[in-house]
Curated annotation (Swiss-Prot):
It comes from Buchnera aphidicola subsp. Baizongia pistaciae (strain Bp). One of its GO terms (biological process) is folic acid-containing compound biosynthetic process. This is Uncharacterized protein bbp_370. It holds the Pfam family 5-FTHF_cyc-lig. Keywords: ATP-binding, Nucleotide-binding. Belongs to the 5-formyltetrahydrofolate cyclo-ligase family. It comes from the Bacteria. SUPFAM superfamilies: NagB/RpiA/CoA transferase-like. InterPro entries: FTHF_cligase, FTHF_cligase-like_sf, NagB/RpiA_transferase-like. NCBIfam families: MTHFS_bact. GO terms for molecular function: 5-formyltetrahydrofolate cyclo-ligase activity; ATP binding.
């Protein structure tokens, strides 16, 4: 079947998530945000990484607003601070200026005093294009999150949580040796838990 090719899977699921109309997309983003706060998954954590939504991903802004209101330290990934394809994280405040990186994704301008490595995070919300019944995710193809998730797999220094629409579930993601399964993926309708 054609859906076994990772590039085809990416195109298919990116197109699928982009088809969700804006009104429903907004409701689903609020639903996920409420679900995260309702389940107490954020108890005893301080530093939370999240992503700026891009290319039809679930809108993280309602969650970011709630995190700020609850006084969590919110961090966004940054890839322009070096060229090693490793993500770092910058503190994100309501007045933080964002610029588009080379992939057209919004990120903060590098500032050493607001920069942390993934080891200093408690939770990392992870974007994905698709996911399967075992927690494996298909990303956009750059490998940035794959390299960070290896740190989770080895050190368990932060807890990664995938955020997705329900339509991004796939029964047949083509897994590669570098892929790391997420322990939790949250969709508007379901908590997928593998821990």
């Amino acid at each position: 079947m054609l859906l076994k090719c990772r590039d085809f899977q990416r195109k298919y699921f990116r197109k699928l998530r982009k088809k969700i109309n804006n009104k429903i997309r907004e409701q689903l983003a609020i639903s996920i945000s409420k679900k995260i706060f309702y389940c107490n998954i954020l108890d005893s954590v301080k530093n939370i990484a999240i992503f700026c939504s891009f290319d039809g991903e679930i809108d993280t802004y309602p969650l970011i607003l709630k995190l700020w209101r609850q006084n969590y330290n919110v961090y966004l990934p940054i890839i322009n601070y070096n060229y090693k394809k490793i993500l770092g994280f910058m503190k994100y405040l309501p007045n933080t200026s964002l610029i588009k990186n080379r992939f057209n994704i919004l990120e903060p301008v590098f500032d050493r005093k607001n920069f942390i490595q993934s080891d200093d995070l408690d939770i990392m919300f992870v974007p994905l294009v698709a996911f399967d019944e075992f927690g494996y995710r298909l990303g956009m193809g750059g490998g940035f999150y794959d390299r960070i998730l290896i740190n989770y797999d080895i050190k368990k220094s932060f807890f990664p949580i995938g955020l997705a629409f329900d339509c991004q579930f796939s029964k047949n993601i083509n897994i590669k040796y570098w892929d790391v399964a997420l322990p939790v993926i949250i969709t508007p309708k379901k908590f997928w838990i593998w821990i």
